[in-house]
A protein has these predicted regions:
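Short edge beta-strand/loop segments characteristic of extracellular beta-sandwich folds
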Residues: 63-70
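Bacterial N-terminal signal peptides
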Residues: 8-20
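Extracellular Ig-like/FN3 beta-sandwich strand-entry sites
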Residues: 75, 114-116
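Solvent-exposed serine/threonine-rich low-complexity stretches and specific carbohydrate-binding patches
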Residues: 89-99
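Short, compositionally biased P/S/T/A/G/V-rich stretches that sit at domain boundaries
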Residues: 25-60
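Conserved aromatic beta-strand anchor motif in extracellular beta-sandwich/beta-rich domains
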Residues: 80-84, 121
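Exposed aromatic-hydrophobic patches
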Residues: 66, 101-109
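Short, exposed beta-strand-loop hairpins at the edges of beta-sheets
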Residues: 96, 109-111, 118-136
């Protein structure tokens, strides 16, 4: 009987340790990192966004969705999904690596498409963790 109880306690303890040390799955509340900044800009220079805005001229050829993440718990991939008038126009997968701070970006050629645009940050399951709206006039 003592062996049986010890075995059950040992298995229970091992499962508890494994479950509490397993990497957290993505959720709306916790993507596995902190989003410090997610902005749309006209350029990225020296890993920093330049010309950040919500409105861009139709003459603007390309914009960037810049992401700064912090406290990344594990290596992962995220996607920046670009929408124009609620129609998906592009999906760019980007790596994010375990780190205190990570900066990355995706660019999108606007090809003169005026109207409402949106860039979404999605995890590998397609869950949206952040979005930025902007207008091309």
């Amino acid at each position: 009987m003592k062996i049986h109880i010890s075995l059950v306690l040992g298995i229970t303890t091992a499962l508890f340790v494994l479950m509490n040390n397993a990497p957290a799955a993505f959720s709306m509340d916790d993507p596995g990192f902190t989003i410090k900044r997610m902005v749309i800009s006209k350029d990225v220079v020296d890993r920093e966004p330049v010309g950040v805005g919500d409105f861009f001229s139709a003459a603007t050829e390309k914009v960037y969705c810049f992401l700064e993440a912090a406290d990344i718990e594990t290596d992962m991939q995220v996607s920046i999904v670009w929408y124009w008038s609620n129609q998906e126009m592009a999906r760019v997968t980007l790596p994010i690596q375990t780190s205190r701070r990570w900066r990355t970006y995706s660019s999108k050629k606007l090809v003169g498409l005026k109207g409402n645009w949106r860039a979404e940050l999605q995890d590998s399951s397609g869950i949206v963790h952040n979005s930025v709206n902007f207008v091309v006039e």
